[in-house]
């Protein structure tokens, strides 16, 4: 009987440990991702020259496949590509992005309203978009 209860307890504990998410469920490991650091809230423009200078192989993908992720969700983007679905000189991306603030730091506190200043992060004002 004790063996049965111990087995049942261990089974339940192991089930709870697998129910936690890693936070990287949005990643599709068959795709390439490039990191952009954002430190100001507003509309941002990334043009052909910026991507090319960063070493991103622009000839290998179509603009219809470009996605942008930040703050644990997909961000809408406006792509100006001349209608040819390729990223050429003069083409650019526009998107709205927010700087890092206290949105995720609130998870550190038992009471989320206990954060000192919700407009500023405890750790860094820069956030990465992919």
Predicted feature locations:
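Bacterial Sec-dependent N-terminal signal peptides
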Residues: 1-23
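Structured catalytic cores of large enzymes
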Residues: 20-40, 54-130
């Amino acid at each position: 009987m004790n063996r049965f209860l111990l087995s049942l307890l261990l089974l339940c504990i192991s089930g709870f440990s697998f129910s936690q998410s890693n936070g990287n469920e949005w990643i599709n490991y068959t795709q390439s991702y490039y990191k952009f650091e954002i430190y100001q809230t507003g509309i941002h423009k990334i043009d052909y020259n910026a991507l090319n200078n960063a070493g991103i192989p622009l000839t290998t993908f179509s603009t219809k496949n470009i996605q942008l992720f930040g703050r644990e969700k997909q961000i809408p983007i406006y792509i100006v590509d001349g209608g040819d679905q390729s990223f050429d000189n003069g083409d650019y991306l526009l998107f709205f992005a927010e700087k890092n603030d206290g949105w995720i730091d609130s998870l550190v506190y038992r009471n989320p309203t206990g954060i000192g200043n919700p407009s500023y992060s405890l750790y860094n004002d820069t956030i990465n978009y992919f």
